[in-house]
Amino acid sequence: SDETEAVDLQGGVCIVEGIHALNPEVTGYDGRTTRIYVSVRTRITPRSGHPLHPSKIRLVRRMLRDSTGRGRALSETIAMRERVDRGEQRYIMPFKPRAHGSIDSFYSAELGVYRPLLRDELERLALPELSDVLEVMRELPDVPADLVPQDSLLREFIGGSTLPY
């Protein structure tokens, strides 16, 4: 959007959240700004020894969020992956070096939470590009979603959050 809005912080703090928040066109060029990149960084290694790339965990998150929040079929989200990846390379990654620090947003139990929500459908789709995701999920126990706090980041993907999105 071309809309801009000036905010007078009066000495306070403003937190801008989102995938485009590192872009200086969004947050400005002010040298006083502290920028933090938040994304999955963890690589899960199944028994086969082939690590699951963080981009696959981000895809799983997108599939769940699109399904629960947007009513989109998993196959639709998977079909959009190439376009989403191109956008990430063009609009997000160039600004990643502007971050003063980074936070790994991976939760150790998250794939176990996603497993009962996704595994059967992923098995049915049998897509070669997701075979590594299935391999990891097959090795994990189910983690009931009701164990995830309602204000957890994971709720953005599985639904049931008390926070507005």
What are the roles of these predicted feature ranges?
Residues 21-165:
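Conserved NTP phosphate-binding and transfer environment spanning the P-loop NTPase/kinase superfamily
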